[in-house]
Amino acid sequence: MYQPEDDNNSDVTSDDDMTRNRRESSPPHSVHSFSGDRDWDRRGRSRDMEPRDRWSHTRNPRSRMPPRDLSLPVVAKTSFEMDREDDRDSRAYESRSQDAESYQNVVDLAEDRKPHNTIQDNMENYRKLLSLGFLAQDSVPAEKRNTEMLDNLPSAGSQFPDFKHLGTFLVFEELVTFEDVLVDFSPEELSSLSAAQRNLYREVMLENYRNLVSLGHQFSKPDIISRLEEEESYAMETDSRHTVICQGESHDDPLEPHQGNQEKLLTPITMNDPKTLTPERSYGSDEFERSSNLSKQSKDPLGKDPQEGTAPGICTSPQSASQENKHNRCEFCKRTFSTQVALRRHERIHTGKKPYECKQCAEAFYLMPHLNRHQKTHSGRKTSGCNEGRKPSVQCANLCERVRIHSQEDYFECFQCGKAFLQNVHLLQHLKAHEAARVLPPGLSHSKTYLIRYQRKHDYVGERACQCCDCGRVFSRNSYLIQHYRTHTQERPYQCQLCGKCFGRPSYLTQHYQLHSQEKTVECDHC
């Protein structure tokens, strides 16, 4: 408890004494400790708990009370305050100078801040400075920069175990080259690109190349840039020509879409060249040629009817399609062809000219495929034996050489009966019938056998009825007709090997064998 002081001391403590006592008081024990305040509070409570009659000191007026220290104790800075200080430092750094910064200054600043990932931040700063072209102005040698930078970095091996060998990738002695920004596609990838993607690729590549040239880069022009520039110039020329030609186009259909413009830029087509309009016809492709001629006569390349006339400004050839066909028209049959080569090949049929001659037998042909097929007969391949006399006979692929084949006139005629077919395969099947008809059954004439197997009751397509010559009965299949014919001839070609009985059908012979299998064998009692 407080003891009363002497009378010599004044009852009221002066302000100077209170200030001196506060200075001599010990500081707080810890930045987070509030023990000083707790002591003051405890002293105050103990003083209030004393009886007022035992308190001998006179209470000081409120105006003369010593001022208490109401300031908060010292507390460690939080992360939020540290971030605010970093922001102020960064703003001060940005406003400090507008000159170009070197890579070393950026690295030092990054090390002072101690970011979470030093390698990633340094690489990002290097890429930004490299894109602005500032590293070329740095006068410090590259080797010295690498050494200083690696020495200044933290040496904690556990945090950056593999950073030493990455130092050579942080600083380069030269600026960016064209190979760094080159987007290289293989021919297969270029062919798979669409027209819009190809145009975008050309624009990006040329823009990157021109940007590097504008920055003062000195290097030879790559081959891909030369090709892209030629393609760009051709595209611009084609667009300008198309604009000039289509200025006089009629405005009846102003919203008519022009499809395929991008494909035309990549694959130029000259409208005056007839070879580009019609594909080359191979040998024996008259049906394709006829269809292409009909399509050309019905519509021009832009889809308009040539009979309606040509509007001014439409990209057409100087001569119409009908006038062009007049030059390729046959004088004998008035048939038109797309090219002069097809016309000359067709005229050989009328003139009888056969320029392709066999060197072994001196037989001439007017088409090369016919000569090639004929030469296979001399090699001895594709032969088979005759059923009766075992004489070598030519296969069906070579039988057409003995027939007058008019491939250009779209029909194939049999030399034996004069029957014509639209396809060569049907003629070969017909010739097989003639070869099979030579094997005659006993007592049957050649003409009768042919009628039994191949005569049709009706001529129109879809009815395949076979009629018997003896009784007039009609069958839908040849096999039924042959079985019916055996009833007239009493032919029984199927003979049992056990008893020698003959049958006209294989099903009858099968049933007969079943009867033999059901017979029970009789055992001899003696043996």
From Swiss-Prot:
Ranges of compositional bias, category Basic and acidic residues: 17-26, 35-56, 80-99, 297-307
Pfam families: KRAB, zf-C2H2, zf-C2H2_4
Gene Ontology terms: biological process: regulation of DNA-templated transcription; regulation of transcription by RNA polymerase II
Free-text tissue specificity from the UniProt record: Highest levels of expression in adult testis; modest levels in fetal kidney and brain.
Region forming the signal peptide: none
Polar residues: compositionally biased ranges: 259-275
GO molecular function, one term: DNA binding
Biased composition (Acidic residues): 1-16
Keywords noted in UniProt: DNA-binding, Metal-binding, Nucleus, Repeat, Transcription, Transcription regulation, Zinc, Zinc-finger
GO cellular component, one term: nucleus
Matching PANTHER family: CHROMATIN-LINKED ADAPTOR FOR MSL PROTEINS, ISOFORM B, ZINC FINGER PROTEIN
Family statement drawn from the similarity comment of this UniProt entry: Belongs to the krueppel C2H2-type zinc-finger protein family.
Record's protein name: Zinc finger imprinted 2
